Amino acid sequence: ENTVKQYPITTYERSYPDIRNQRYPLAGEMVPDVKVFIYDISNKLFVPVDVGVNPDQYITGIRWSPDNKTLIVQKLTRDQKKLEVLKADAVTGKTSPLYSEESRADYVTVHPGNGWFIDGGRSLLWMSEKDGYNHLYNIMADSGTVIPVTQGKWEVMDIKATDDEKKEIFYTSNEANSREKQLYKISYDGKNRTRITTGRGYHDVWISNDKRFIFDEFSSVNTPPVYQSMSVTGKDQRKLIENKELKDRLQDFPVPDVNFFTVRANDSMTMNGWIIRPYQNPRAQLPLLLYVYGGSTKQEAQDRWTDRFTLTMRWLANQGYAVACIDPRGTPGKGAAFRKCTYKAPGDVEISDLLTVKSYLSRNYRIDSSQVAVMRWSYGGYLAALAQTKYAGKFKSGVAIAPVTNWRYYENIYSERLLSLPSENAEGYKKSSPINYTDDYKGGLFIVHGTADDNVHLQNSLELSKQLTNSRKTNFEQHFYPDKTHNLSDGTPNILRVSLYTRINEFLKRELK
């Protein structure tokens, strides 16, 4: 990592602030020069693996074959357009190509932990969206022949386990509904696909090593988590924890339900969303809080319960707002075309989709379209900042928590996946960064950041604040949490959350009439 520049993270707990230097490659900067070695225990020698001489590449995964004679190495080009899978001889370190994947139009999606050996090492189980949706494939270890295992206009989400004895793969997918996560099993040859979990909603599952039992954490957007066990056939279900205490406590509070909706983004793509209205509110029209993440790695409008956000959004709704969550184009779960349409121009498509949702909700849910705020963290904070600068006047206000405000200030893998390298798309970096539109800002922005954020550095919010000031704008607010990192959750998370959402509510009360 000596080639990677250091970024100082400052904390203020002592008389003299502490500075921790973090190796952090920004967009366009030098990346770590990674080499792969095999250590021969008997000879006590390091055997170099031939992955090429190009230092400007990523090693995205390594995995041993079951007989320990072969090491599988995955490498990705710096522009993330080509992924190669190499077979390395464990004795000599020499490599031969097994498989490659290339995307000239945008980028290749890398799946952490990809490349399970199955069938006694005869094939490699692979996840890829090369045919438009994320699916399973078998790559034959001797020839590199690729055989599809799953197919369809839905996506595999995780590989949970494989059973060589029965030649079965256990995986989760959103085949039943793009808002849900269900467990399935399928034969190695792609036959006998069977759904195992049954309850509508979201199933996080773990499978025992002997492939006999499943532990299932099940929830839906209106149902707190239930923990249960079952056989691998889905039968013999036994509830282990019903979360009765939480359910009983919720009976004492006016908790509004979450309702799902679907909005058409264009002629061929639809977006998932949900909306919460106050438990009791006589107003003919309500102000709207659009809660959106929008990044390429995560869906939010799912049929699942998350304590931090499910309850917090309900609490905000009971303060007098309608709260809606949307997964715009650019998010996963609906195919490569849906997710990658933001390539080289992030922000524009997502904001267009938020405007579509604003219009839809104002027509169908008694929303005051003149009183709409955008709020979220990280990439969602970026969208909130962009909405109030580049798209000033389209939304009444925004809450930008730990926002990226200039993609040149963010780490290289994510930024370059979105925008390519700065040297190849300088105009795209300029047009997608909120700091370049502060002259257009009209008001209504609340900026929040932890000063020790080692993911999205404080520099992003400080630079936005500076540019707003240079543009002679004074009608924005900001609050910084000293010595706190990206999630504002280290140390005393409950105190921080109460502080954060109290401040947000006070800001929205002033902004949304």
Which residues fall in each region the model found?
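Beta-propeller folds
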Residues: 1-216, 221-225, 229-230
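Serine-hydrolase catalytic core recognition
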Residues: 5-6, 68, 74, 204-513
